[in-house]
């Protein structure tokens, strides 16, 4: 299941906790996305998990059986043809991790909504994730009706009808529903066929400035590494425009918080691209699509533990402005997304909101709210262009709940 082709599209795997998203990634890519030790303990994806999968086609077989992820077709004893490599973003389904899901949605070109046939539709996070796709405007969607091997035909049919009813009037209306069993790897060919037709590779402009949304950052050095062997910090995320080459100089904004003369301010960080990893291989150049790792000259102490997640990277001087306060046009949902689903009240001055812009999540305090706009002072600044979409979450009880979408003025 290996491939040296760069991924060209990012596909989100979204849906309720334990509905089988991570198992599905494993069936498609042979990789398990839960790499985080805490995730192994809790059995849920906490940070975004990434895995690449290469879709292939057997030249001798009829469709849809021809679609596969295997390099060799045993039935016809021939090597399969490469179609394209895609990156899967496995977004957490646990409700307290909604912010992570939203920041992941910023780099998705399409999504597979995984819904288990063993439970009534919709479950709370299924609804929440679909609202997030709606808000961010992701409408290339395929629905995987998973675990059909665990129910009888009548129950599977009831579940299918519930799914159709649930997606009516949303971005997923009309999306194909593919019955699968990720655990048994059944109907994976049908799922690949649906993804190939519903989630095309977007057209990209290679001549624009490189722009990378940083979703993760790491220190890859093992404890006890000697000074001579120390590797620079690594950024993980997605290139959304232009192309990036090894040895390019890049700037990260908003950068780092620096204390000078008793005052703290945010300063951009500049570094050199030391290495590029895409599709599991080291490459000299990356273009948009897929998820990439960028080895840098940064001190690993400032990249460890996702400390630079939410930054934007690109050639120095080319990035959008950094905002410590901003005004946004607000479009509220009618009801709070989640299991209790009360009505959404207007935003009021002084209330705290959790805002997700691109891959950045920050808390802001509303300094002024009137009609369909509000001004917000941010705890952590964000780098974002005018017109950027903002997912707005409000504290309801002990949790942050999605209540609407903002557009940056």
Curated annotation (Swiss-Prot):
<keyword id="KW-0378">Hydrolase</keyword>
<dbReference type="InterPro" id="IPR005225">
    <property type="entry name" value="Small_GTP-bd"/>
</dbReference>
<dbReference type="InterPro" id="IPR027417">
    <property type="entry name" value="P-loop_NTPase"/>
</dbReference>
<dbReference type="GO" id="GO:0003743">
    <property type="term" value="F:translation initiation factor activity"/>
</dbReference>
<feature type="region of interest" description="G2">
    <location>
        <begin position="43"/>
        <end position="47"/>
    </location>
</feature>
<keyword id="KW-0547">Nucleotide-binding</keyword>
<comment type="function">
    <text>eIF-2 functions in the early steps of protein synthesis by forming a ternary complex with GTP and initiator tRNA.</text>
</comment>
<dbReference type="InterPro" id="IPR015256">
    <property type="entry name" value="eIF2g_C"/>
</dbReference>
<dbReference type="InterPro" id="IPR009001">
    <property type="entry name" value="Transl_elong_EF1A/Init_IF2_C"/>
</dbReference>
<dbReference type="InterPro" id="IPR009000">
    <property type="entry name" value="Transl_B-barrel_sf"/>
</dbReference>
<comment type="subunit">
    <text>Heterotrimer composed of an alpha, a beta and a gamma chain.</text>
</comment>
<feature type="region of interest" description="G4">
    <location>
        <begin position="146"/>
        <end position="149"/>
    </location>
</feature>
<feature type="domain" description="tr-type G">
    <location>
        <begin position="6"/>
        <end position="203"/>
    </location>
</feature>
<dbReference type="GO" id="GO:0046872">
    <property type="term" value="F:metal ion binding"/>
</dbReference>
<dbReference type="GO" id="GO:0005829">
    <property type="term" value="C:cytosol"/>
</dbReference>
<protein>
    <recommendedName>
        <fullName>Translation initiation factor 2 subunit gamma</fullName>
        <ecNumber>3.6.5.3</ecNumber>
    </recommendedName>
</protein>
<feature type="region of interest" description="G1">
    <location>
        <begin position="15"/>
        <end position="22"/>
    </location>
</feature>
<dbReference type="InterPro" id="IPR050543">
    <property type="entry name" value="eIF2G"/>
</dbReference>
<feature type="region of interest" description="G3">
    <location>
        <begin position="90"/>
        <end position="93"/>
    </location>
</feature>
<dbReference type="GO" id="GO:0001731">
    <property type="term" value="P:formation of translation preinitiation complex"/>
</dbReference>
<dbReference type="InterPro" id="IPR044128">
    <property type="entry name" value="eIF2g_GTP-bd"/>
</dbReference>
<feature type="binding site">
    <location>
        <position position="43"/>
    </location>
    <ligand>
        <name>Mg(2+) 2</name>
    </ligand>
</feature>
<dbReference type="InterPro" id="IPR022424">
    <property type="entry name" value="TIF2_gsu"/>
</dbReference>
<dbReference type="GO" id="GO:0000049">
    <property type="term" value="F:tRNA binding"/>
</dbReference>
<comment type="similarity">
    <text>Belongs to the TRAFAC class translation factor GTPase superfamily. Classic translation factor GTPase family. EIF2G subfamily.</text>
</comment>
<feature type="binding site">
    <location>
        <position position="18"/>
    </location>
    <ligand>
        <name>Mg(2+) 2</name>
    </ligand>
</feature>
<feature type="binding site">
    <location>
        <begin position="18"/>
        <end position="23"/>
    </location>
    <ligand>
        <name>GTP</name>
    </ligand>
</feature>
<dbReference type="GO" id="GO:0003924">
    <property type="term" value="F:GTPase activity"/>
</dbReference>
<feature type="region of interest" description="G5">
    <location>
        <begin position="181"/>
        <end position="183"/>
    </location>
</feature>
<keyword id="KW-0342">GTP-binding</keyword>
<feature type="binding site">
    <location>
        <begin position="146"/>
        <end position="149"/>
    </location>
    <ligand>
        <name>GTP</name>
    </ligand>
</feature>
<keyword id="KW-0460">Magnesium</keyword>
<dbReference type="GO" id="GO:0005525">
    <property type="term" value="F:GTP binding"/>
</dbReference>
<keyword id="KW-0648">Protein biosynthesis</keyword>
<dbReference type="Pfam" id="PF09173">
    <property type="entry name" value="eIF2_C"/>
</dbReference>
<feature type="binding site">
    <location>
        <position position="45"/>
    </location>
    <ligand>
        <name>Mg(2+) 1</name>
    </ligand>
</feature>
<feature type="binding site">
    <location>
        <position position="22"/>
    </location>
    <ligand>
        <name>Mg(2+) 1</name>
    </ligand>
</feature>
<dbReference type="Pfam" id="PF00009">
    <property type="entry name" value="GTP_EFTU"/>
</dbReference>
<dbReference type="GO" id="GO:0003746">
    <property type="term" value="F:translation elongation factor activity"/>
</dbReference>
<feature type="binding site">
    <location>
        <begin position="181"/>
        <end position="183"/>
    </location>
    <ligand>
        <name>GTP</name>
    </ligand>
</feature>
<dbReference type="InterPro" id="IPR000795">
    <property type="entry name" value="T_Tr_GTP-bd_dom"/>
</dbReference>
<keyword id="KW-0479">Metal-binding</keyword>
């Amino acid at each position: 299941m290996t491939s040296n082709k760069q991924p060209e599209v990012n596909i989100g795997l979204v849906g309720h906790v334990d509905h089988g998203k991570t198992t599905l990634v494993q069936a498609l890519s042979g990789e398990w996305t839960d790499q985080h030790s805490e995730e192994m303990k809790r059995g849920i994806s906490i940070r975004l998990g990434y895995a690449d999968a290469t879709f292939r086609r057997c030249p001798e077989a009829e469709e849809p059986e021809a679609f596969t992820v295997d390099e060799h077709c045993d039935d016809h004893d021939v090597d399969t043809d490469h179609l394209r490599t895609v990156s899967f973003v496995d977004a957490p389904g646990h409700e307290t991790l909604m912010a992570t899901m939203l920041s992941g949605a910023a780099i998705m070109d399409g999504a597979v909504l995984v819904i288990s046939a063993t439970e009534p539709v919709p479950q709370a996070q299924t609804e929440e994730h679909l609202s997030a796709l709606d808000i961010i405007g992701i409408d290339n969607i395929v629905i995987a009706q998973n675990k059909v091997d665990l129910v009888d035909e009548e129950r599977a049919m009831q579940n299918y009808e519930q799914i159709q009813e649930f997606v009516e009037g949303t971005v997923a209306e009309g999306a194909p529903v593919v019955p699968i069993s990720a655990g048994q790897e059944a109907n994976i060919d049908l799922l690949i066929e649906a993804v190939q037709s519903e989630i095309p590779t977007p057209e990209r402009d290679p001549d624009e400035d490189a722009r990378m949304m940083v979703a993760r950052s790491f220190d890859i050095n093992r404890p006890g590494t000697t000074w001579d062997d120390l590797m620079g910090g690594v950024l993980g995320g997605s290139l959304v425009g232009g192309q990036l080459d090894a040895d390019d100089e890049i700037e990260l904004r908003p950068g780092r918080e620096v204390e000078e003369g008793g005052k703290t301010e945010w300063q951009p960080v500049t570094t050199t691209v030391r290495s590029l990893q895409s599709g599991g291989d080291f490459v000299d150049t990356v273009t948009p699509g897929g998820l990439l790792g960028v080895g840098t000259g940064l001190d690993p102490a400032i990249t460890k533990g996702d400390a630079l997640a939410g930054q934007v990277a690109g050639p120095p001087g080319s990035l959008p402005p950094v905002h410590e306060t901003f005004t946004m046009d607000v479009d509220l949902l009618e009801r709070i997304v989640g299991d209790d689903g009360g009505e959404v009240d207007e935003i009021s001055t002084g209330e705290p909101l959790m805002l997700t812009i691109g891959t950045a999540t920050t808390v802001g305090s509303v300094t002024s709210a009137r009609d369909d706009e509000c001004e917000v002072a941010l705890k952590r600044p964000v780098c974002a262009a005018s017109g950027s979409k903002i997912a707005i979450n409000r504290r309801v009880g002990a949790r942050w709940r999605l209540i609407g979408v903002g557009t940056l003025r």
